[in-house]
A protein has these predicted regions:
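Non-globular targeting/processing and membrane-anchoring segments
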Residues: 2-114, 131-137, 141, 148-237
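Short His-Asn-centered micro-motif
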Residues: 79-80, 118-124, 129, 145
Length: 237
């Protein structure tokens, strides 16, 4: 086996020197953790917006309201899943990037233990959703907002722009007080990375995400962002 080192690799050092460098990085990592804790504390204190409009979705067992999606719990995390004619693979498949996100949602028992439910919502008809959900092997609750104002009201279906084709993914958080519902938080774009393990794991590796925007050593493999994302059964074997 060849031991020749690539010119683009970082310095190769003895274990004690590596430990010293690692400890310096750890100081910064701990500072970042404390900053994120402080940010989360601010997020918990954001003002909330009441949701007075009645929304009804198509679920696997019939019509369900936004209140029903809480399943009796106080909190609801809702992923706005892109699934419309502007999405690659329509009408048989949902957005590849959104599929990557849902692949990373773990067993919901852990959220339920903290009085929190999770659901995905798409504007696609329920039949399309069922087909893609079965193909992907998911158990995550997923309902259809087809024929409702839900996507438009929450800014997820809009007029096309130079940045998107008219449908946008995102993550909303709702809070229930009795039968009153409030929207407490929303994020989209890179904010959604917070719920994904793929990006966090890749960030721990020497190559990183291997995307062109990253500051990596010269010669490290990089491709345009998003373009490498596929539905999990579409990657080259």
């Amino acid at each position: 086996m060849s031991t020749k080192r690539s010119k683009s690799m970082p310095r190769i050092v003895p274990a004690d020197e590596w430990q010293t460098a690692r400890k310096k990085l750890l100081v910064k990592e701990k500072a970042m953790t404390r900053s994120l804790d402080a940010l989360a504390a601010e997020r918990r204190r954001l003002p909330m917006v009441p949701i007075d409009k009645k929304y009804v979705f198509d679920g696997p067992d019939g019509k369900v309201s936004l209140l029903d999606l809480f399943e009796g719990r106080r909190q609801l995390i809702l992923y706005h899943f892109m699934f419309s004619p502007v999405v690659s693979g329509w009408p048989s498949a949902g957005c590849p990037g959104c599929s990557l996100v849902i692949d990373q949602i773990g067993h919901l028992a852990h959220l339920h233990a903290r009085d929190t439910s999770f659901v995905a919502v798409s504007i696609a008809p329920l039949a399309n959703i069922k087909k893609h959900k079965k193909r992907m092997g998911w158990t995550v609750p997923w309902v259809s907002s087809f024929g409702t104002d839900f996507n438009k009201d929450f800014g997820r279906t809009t007029e096309p722009t130079d940045k998107h084709d008219g449908e946008i993914f995102g993550l909303s958080v709702f809070f229930r007080d009795g039968k009153r519902i409030y929207r407490s938080y929303f994020t989209d774009g890179r904010g959604v990375e917070a719920i994904g393990t793929v990006w966090q794991l890749l960030d721990l590796t020497p190559f990183g995400r291997q995307e062109k925007w990253e500051d990596s050593p010269a010669g490290w493999p990089q491709t345009p962002p998003f373009e490498w994302w596929e539905r999990h059964d579409e990657y080259p074997k």
